[in-house]
């Protein structure tokens, strides 16, 4: 299984319950499509290097995933692009 790290930035003015629901939803998208979530944790609220959608800071969330193929990652990528609460995301394949 290949190991991946997903980092996404959530808009800072989201309510705590909505943020938890968003994180749970995207974790379940990964597991429903065949990936294993090793770790999913909030990083911190950080200042952005430049404004994104009129926000100067964002809530960073890191997910470590193991997957046999890219199905789960492609679905995560597709849905995070159309979700208004996620400002940016990045998927990186980790060296074994």
From Swiss-Prot:
Keyword GTP-binding attributed: no
Family to which this protein belongs: Belongs to the bacterial ribosomal protein bS6 family.
The protein, known as: Small ribosomal subunit protein bS6
NCBIfam families: S6
Function: Binds together with bS18 to 16S ribosomal RNA.
GO cellular component: cytoplasm; ribonucleoprotein complex; ribosome
Keywords associated with the record: Ribonucleoprotein, Ribosomal protein, RNA-binding, rRNA-binding
GO biological process: translation
One GO MF term attached to the UniProt entry: small ribosomal subunit rRNA binding
One Pfam family named in its UniProt record: Ribosomal_S6
Cited InterPro entries: Ribosomal_bS6 (IPR000529), Ribosomal_bS6_sf (IPR035980), Ribosomal_S6_plastid/chlpt (IPR020814), Transl_elong_EF1B/ribsomal_bS6 (IPR014717)
């Amino acid at each position: 299984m290949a190991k991946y790290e997903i980092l996404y930035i959530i808009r800072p003015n989201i309510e705590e319950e909505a943020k938890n629901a968003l994180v749970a939803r995207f974790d379940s998208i990964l597991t429903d499509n065949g990936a294993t979530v090793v770790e999913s944790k909030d990083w911190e609220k950080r200042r952005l290097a430049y404004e994104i959608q009129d926000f100067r800071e964002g809530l960073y969330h890191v997910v470590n995933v193991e997957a046999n193929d890219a199905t789960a990652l492609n679905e995560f990528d597709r849905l995070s692009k159309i979700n208004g609460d996620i400002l940016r995301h990045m998927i990186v394949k980790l060296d074994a």
